[in-house]
A protein has these predicted regions:
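Conserved active-site alpha-helix within GNAT-family acetyltransferase domains
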Residues: 109-113, 118-143
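Short amphipathic alpha-helix that is part of the acyltransferase structural core
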Residues: 2-40, 47-62, 153-164
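Conserved beta-strand in the GNAT
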Residues: 55, 61-71, 77-85
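Non-DNA-binding regulatory cores of transcription-related proteins
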Residues: 133-150, 159-164
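Short, solvent-exposed loop/turn elements at beta->coil junctions and helix N-caps
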Residues: 41-46, 135-137
Length: 164
């Protein structure tokens, strides 16, 4: 499917079901490869409780996914967004942005200080994310890519810890 056709085709973004796990994992592996296991963000996700999983469906096929994970930044309760995955044949059509927007909307309904992520600033700034250089992740990360979307708290400082 082309990106132009995708824009005219509504995709359902729905909560992830337990039966979706294998398809989501395959999508994440295709997008990030096995190298993702070496990333600091993956260390956080391995220890944190998933608070939300969303998938994008094109018919019966899962073509996108995104998750929120329970964390704290300093003393501020928050959620950690990622990974965002979109099937190769559905990229460039805005689906990644739709998934981020759905997560942001869900996070604003939670009692959290905000949403933290590690990502490309020019992409995420359009959703309201701002630099969070003093949020200290438990491993190496490019601080310029650590971003915060305030929900109930300004940009926090301190260590990022997973909440099980």
């Amino acid at each position: 499917m082309t990106a132009a056709a995708l824009r005219n085709t509504p995709l359902a973004i729905t909560p992830e079901l337990p039966s979706d796990r294998a398809a989501v994992e395959a999508l994440v592996l295709a997008a990030f490869g096995p190298g993702r296991y070496a990333k600091t963000a993956e260390r956080i996700r391995e220890q944190a409780r998933m608070t939300l999983g969303l998938v994008a469906r094109d018919g019966d096929r899962i073509v996108g996914s995104v998750h929120l994970w329970a964390i704290t930044v300093g003393e501020v309760p928050a959620v950690f967004l990622g990974p965002i995955t979109v099937a190769t044949d559905h990229r460039k059509g805005g689906l990644g942005g739709d998934l981020v927007a759905a997560c942001v909307e869900a996070a604003t309904q939670e009692t959290v200080g905000g949403v933290l992520l590690v990502g490309d600033p020019p992409y995420f700034e359009r959703f309201g994310f701002q630099p969070a250089p003093d949020a200290r992740l438990p491993g190496p990360v490019d601080r310029r890519r650590v971003m915060w979307l305030p929900v109930m708290a300004p940009v926090p400082t301190g260590p990022v810890k997973a909440v099980a």
